[in-house]
Amino acid sequence: MRRASNGKPGKPIESIQRQLAISLSHIFRFMAIVYIVYHSGYGHTKLQAEAVHRGASLVSGIQANIRTTEEASANLDELDEADAIIFGCPTYMGNMSADMKKFIEAAASKWFTLTWKDKIAGAFTNSSSFSGDKLNTLLGLVINAMQHGMIYVGTGMLPAANRPEDMHSIAGPSPEALNRVGSFTGAMAASFQVPPPSAPVQGDIQTAEAYGKRVAEITLRWTKAKA
């Protein structure tokens, strides 16, 4: 531990060196880095996460990486290099899964130094019904991002964006409709009791792809503005 000029303890040398290395890597690299960190209990959210990853990978100038919460918890420092982190998990009993909560609590070590401050953030979730109180899960992930000082990005997509005529049907948007669940906070999917890969349906998967692409595009704009 070094001491600052005022005699008070300063940051550990190792912490300063790590931050310097990250700063230099940002100066000399030409790719913005996006991480998708997810937990999936039965495989539905895994398909959603992979779709978010595909969407982010479509953006030129983006290096997209995907990690489970277990993998990310084992190597939290890896996320320090990210320009954006997109969090995803299933909704269980109206809340985020225990595995995602465990990751969030492990990542509290980054909160003390605000290491993830000003990184872009996003979130997605899946449940077994149209509602399932999924919004509560997304809000929990949003609050986690705010605790870290991150900048959160929503879907920016109208319900049934590619099939507006579906909004005039009492049955609501079809399985092919983008944002058929109508979420502005983050990407949602409804799998009911259908096993993967039949669920999530095409519209939910394409919504996740579009969301990953949107977050990546905003991340690229943000990193260029900071350069």
Where does each model-flagged region fall?
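N-terminal amphipathic/basic-hydrophobic helices that include classical n-h-c signal peptides
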Residues: 1-30
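Intrinsically disordered, low-complexity segments enriched in small/polar residues
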Residues: 5-8, 41, 59, 170, ...
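Glycine-centered flexibility motif
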Residues: 10, 55, 98, 133, ...
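Helix-loop-strand module that forms the ligand-binding subsite of alpha/beta enzymes
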Residues: 70-170
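Mobile beta-alpha loop/short-helix "lid" or hinge segments that flank ligand
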Residues: 151-195
